[in-house]
């Protein structure tokens, strides 16, 4: 690619126009001239920090819960496990020996 021109080119909408090369448009990125000032640690910035409010008690069915005392992590884990079947399935070998005889056309 050729080097960018030394003189200032006309900008549209605040940026340089795209260059067409090989049938595709290529956007030329330019460096912004705006410098962001560094944030300084002042006493004023610490005054406006928010404090996390204490957790409010949760009411379940009219009773105030006590956090992990009412619902332990182990009890919650059991509630999310897959249920164990009460009856066992038959072995798959019995189903393979059955043949269905159908007449041909």
Swiss-Prot record:
Similarity-based family: Belongs to the DAP-DAPL1 family.
GO BP annotation list: apoptotic signaling pathway; negative regulation of autophagy; ribosome hibernation
Keywords per UniProt: Translation regulation
UniProt keyword annotation of Cytoplasm present: no
KW Metal-binding (keyword) present: no
Function: Ribosome-binding protein involved in ribosome hibernation, a process during which ribosomes are stabilized in an inactive state and preserved from proteasomal degradation. Acts via its association with eiF5a (eif5a and eif5a2) at the polypeptide exit tunnel of the ribosome, preventing mRNA translation. Involved in ribosome hibernation in the mature egg by preventing mRNA translation, leading to ribosome inactivation. Ribosomes, which are produced in large quantities during oogenesis, are stored and translationally repressed in the egg and early embryo.
Residues making up the signal peptide according to the UniProt record: none
Name of the protein in its database record: Death-associated protein 1 homolog
GO molecular function: ribosome binding
Region (Disordered): 75-105
Species: Danio rerio (Zebrafish)
Domain of life: Eukaryota
